[in-house]
């Protein structure tokens, strides 16, 4: 139940002409200190209409406001503060969670709508680095959140399996590669060749030309070029699949850039039909001068297509195939101009569905204050970080709970969860300084802290068996009330995370719930035999439901024992 809405409805009966219910709801605040109640309405906006001081208006409103749902109404300066009936609210909230279980928090505003989410999208023949973690986990979380809000979600891994870099890689392999060596450790060896190409090209400009020539051969279907490309792609997808399994990430499809090669000429034909193509120094472009942007390059002077051509083609294909209402591109901020050009070209074609398309950028993972770069080899491999995190979790379990069943599985959940939560706990546009030490801490604002809180709550429930269906829940103490208020916010938290494309809204929320529950655990004798025992256990159960579901929305597992 939305209790602020109830407050707004009560106030709207007083302000029948002055403010709409929505205007009232937008003005209602949550006091930072408990002594000022559970909700507050500021009267500043009414001073001009009433020709009275806000404090006087607040007193008059407080006298008129009568509702059994409020145990106390008071005017404090220019604010009308209300205290909700704790027994009524706690009973309603707990019964809702107990009935809905993991469905609690489900929203319906995405019902009968489709969202396409383009995320992860690593490049073939390059290691899966920590730098890929952000797009992968932000996109994965947004997928879960959108599904929770009723959307039909299509999760696409737009693999970087095409482009001039493959001409460079083929050139490097032909010059310095050894088939037997590459077969021993394909991704690492191919990456070494990629880095070597960029080191050598500074002294040998002809290498760049050779790279372009090999990519042209690849586009034209040259047998040797295609065979090498297929090999690079096959080996890369094997590595990616292993890492996605560790992270618990799944996709609807893996349609990479190469998938659209045979569709691009049709799209270029559409641009020609709309008279949007211009020739510029032998290349084909869409002029975006009126929009204040550089021209969007569609085809190079040598006839090769580029990233923008494939993205435009892919967008039309996805709209025709999935009929999306929204399309999110979870890609770094360095691509902002590309997406502005890309969306603008679609608008110039008259496609109204482009209004539902959005670039979802994020900050970088930094190493020593610098962005990681695959070209220069400044790279930390994600798989190595995950393996180390899992090993550390295993050591921790051996020390604290050596008799734990399924230790390896729990260590995987905790280790991977630590890495994922570290990535998602801050607002997505913030840069993250890579620190294995901070990422793997098992206290403070970390994934393992939330997981441990969930496991602690589960351990309490294993000690008692209660039939909640016949109970009426009457919790009034401050510690219980703080948790109930937090649990009641979960549906709105999910809605906010979806609207803002911001998983950190949920990360911060589950940390708040965990911290509030741990205070409760430290101050309340939960299993004492008295009239409120069943209510306390219902509260503990509700906490496990919300923590587990909140972590799931982030892509983090919630073990019941740790």
Swiss-Prot record:
EC nos: 6.1.1.19
Keyword Aminoacyl-tRNA synthetase: yes
Protein family according to the UniProt entry: Belongs to the class-I aminoacyl-tRNA synthetase family.
Subunit structure, as described in the record: Monomer.
Localization: Cytoplasm
PANTHER family: ARGININE--TRNA LIGASE, CYTOPLASMIC, ARGINYL-TRNA SYNTHETASE
Name of the molecule in the record: Arginine--tRNA ligase 1
Main location: cytoplasm
Organism of derivation: Bacillus thuringiensis subsp. konkukian (strain 97-27)
Entry keyword set: Aminoacyl-tRNA synthetase, ATP-binding, Cytoplasm, Ligase, Nucleotide-binding, Protein biosynthesis
Any Gene Ontology biological process: arginyl-tRNA aminoacylation
Pfam families assigned to the protein according to its UniProt record, in alphabetical order: Arg_tRNA_synt_N, DALR_1, tRNA-synt_1d
